[in-house]
Design a protein with these regions (language model features):
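A residue-level marker of the well-folded mature domains of exported/periplasmic proteins
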Residues: 1-359
């Protein structure tokens, strides 16, 4: 039996990995979900800047499409997030975008939302009506190759490297496999720490870096998600161990990382997964779903390395994601969409760890 106030059990979705064809935007319309609010809710794991970008993109899309918009932030608490998603279902919410704190514990509640007929867009882990991911190996390779080039050209092929990983989130593992692959080609590279911070935020990165510096005070390269690498930079500065010739590089294109790159200090690169742009697209898809239209089953946000040379154009794009979405050529430089699903075919929701890199 379903819990009180929740929908009944439904179909299991697609549980075995498949390769989705390209999205067909001209597919015939379906039924509109009945009895659901014209609402968009963002179930947010925490307040890091990357997720603030998601929130902004969703809010802009909701405004453009006439949806009410709500944010439920879980502050890294899986139980709180589960309660928030249950509340979404019991209040007949129309569309949910979620960045799960713990994908396993939240999965049953997300399925209830899917079975209710709502649009559910998930950022990386399943289940979801429409799943957002990045080509994770390529994302890591872009950063790893930038770091390797810097080590070879600026550090004479010698570097002590710290990798701040996300081992608790298996879907991101290919990022770090790619970074290791890029670095292993350089004989003079020593990875002195390969470790997951307890929390994926600046505080977690700073705490981990302080521990690393006790054993290895002279670090040349730090790589990971922007938010934890920014924390590592703070720890380097507070201990007097930051140097202009270091290479700190991250993934996510967070505003603080972009500002650090512009300043010309140790932070040299950020691989952008432009969160306002993919979030705006998810918000548009949510509105399309509620109007009985087809949406993608999966979508890639394509990685791009930010440099001093291209940051201005990138900042203009993320400031106005609506204009990016309306321009097919510009949109295709950021987003790639796969598969088709609508209210009538919602039993085909995604419940496997989808990646466009799976062949």
């Amino acid at each position: 039996m379903a819990q009180s106030g929740m929908t009944q059990e439904g179909p299991p979705g697609i549980t075995r990995p498949v390769v989705f064809p390209p999205f067909k935007p001209d597919a015939p319309d379906c039924s509109r979900p009945a009895g659901l609010r014209k609402s968009l809710t963002f179930a947010q794991d925490n307040g890091r800047k990357f997720m603030q970008g998601v929130a902004r993109g969703l809010e802009l899309a909701a405004k453009d499409r006439g949806l009410t918009y709500e944010i439920d932030q879980a502050n890294n608490d899986p139980a709180v997030m589960t309660a928030q998603v249950r509340k979404f279902v019991s209040s007949s919410g129309g569309a949910l975008v979620i960045s799960p704190v713990d994908s396993q514990s939240i999965s049953p509640a997300i399925k209830q939302a899917i079975w209710s007929g709502a649009y559910v867009g998930a950022i990386v882990p399943p289940p979801a009506t429409s799943l957002l991911n990045a080509p994770q190996y390529l994302t890591g390779k872009v950063l790893g190759d930038e770091a390797a080039d810097y080590i070879n050209t600026r550090l004479k092929g010698m570097a002590k490297v710290v990798l701040l990983t996300h081992d608790q989130l298996q879907f991101l593992a290919p990022r770090f496999a790619a970074i290791r692959d890029s670095l292993k080609e350089i004989p003079g590279v020593t990875i002195v720490a390969d470790i997951s911070p307890l929390t994926v935020d600046e505080a977690g990165g700073a705490a981990t870096m302080r521990t690393v510096l006790l054993a290895e005070p002279d670090i040349d390269v730090v790589l990971g998600a922007d938010t934890v690498v920014l924390g590592a930079l703070a720890a380097l500065r507070e201990t007097g161990k930051a140097r202009p010739d270091q290479f700190l590089g991250g993934i996510d294109g967070e505003p603080a990382a972009v500002a650090e790159i512009k300043s010309g200090g140790p932070y040299k690169a950020s691989v952008s997964l432009a969160s306002p742009i993919f979030a705006y697209a998810m918000g548009q898809h949510a509105a399309d779903w509620l109007e009985g239209k087809n949406v993608p089953q999966a979508m890639d946000i394509l990685p791009r390395s930010l440099t001093l040379q291209n940051i201005a154009g990138y900042e203009a794009d993320v400031a106005d994601p609506g204009s990016v979405y309306k321009d097919p050529v510009l949109r295709a430089s950021y987003l790639r969409m796969y598969g088709n699903i609508c209210f009538d075919s919602r039993e085909n929701f995604v419940d496997f760890p989808w990646s466009s890199e799976r062949k």
